[in-house]
Amino acid sequence: MILRMLEEERGPQSTWAVGPLYRSRFPSTSLNRWMPQISNVISNDLTPTWEVTPSVSRQMSFSFIVRDNGSGFANGIGQTSTDLMDISVEDSDPFVILTPNTDVIWNVGSTEMISWDVGQTDNTTINCQTVNIKLSTDGGMTYPILLSSNTPNDGSEAIMIPNILTTSARVMVEAADTIETALDISCSSSANLILDDFRRL
């Protein structure tokens, strides 16, 4: 009993080959579920106490549950639906953005280079052949702006800075042709980017 209590307080470990690594969360209006939470991802913390990205090869099984509260049924009897998904995790080199990796100012209309370490994501097991490059203007919480679509997963891409001014931009590279984007293969820059108009500098 004492050992179990200590284990529960410690939380899951990235080296676990079996057992749960992520927790259930309350319903949300968001169409995306970040694992771990997006606030952890953008601070480069993929192993917070209760949601841990695995560092070893393993299988993970997920259950997505939708439940209504029965408001449209007699006596308030609700309905549920479940979708199951299994994911294979590869113990391989990380998929990470290399540049930008420091705070920098980019001018609207300029062409900038994004580079990333492909790791082993382009091998036959993971088979990520193309990526999307997206831009966040709110510090990495959302990535609504598509800078490049279905570009080869070759580690670099020149992108044009859109006509948007912000002091808290981030860049994300995500797989375009597999499920992977930290649980999906995705990586966001750790740098804080400032998008400015050179005419104002």
Labelled PLM ranges:
Residues 1-57, 125-158:
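Exoplasmic/lumenal beta-rich domain surfaces
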Residues 73-93, 186-191:
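C-terminal edge beta-strand
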Residues 103-110:
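Short, solvent-exposed loop/linker segments at the N-terminal edge
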Residues 111-115:
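A short beta-strand segment in extracellular, disulfide-stabilized domains
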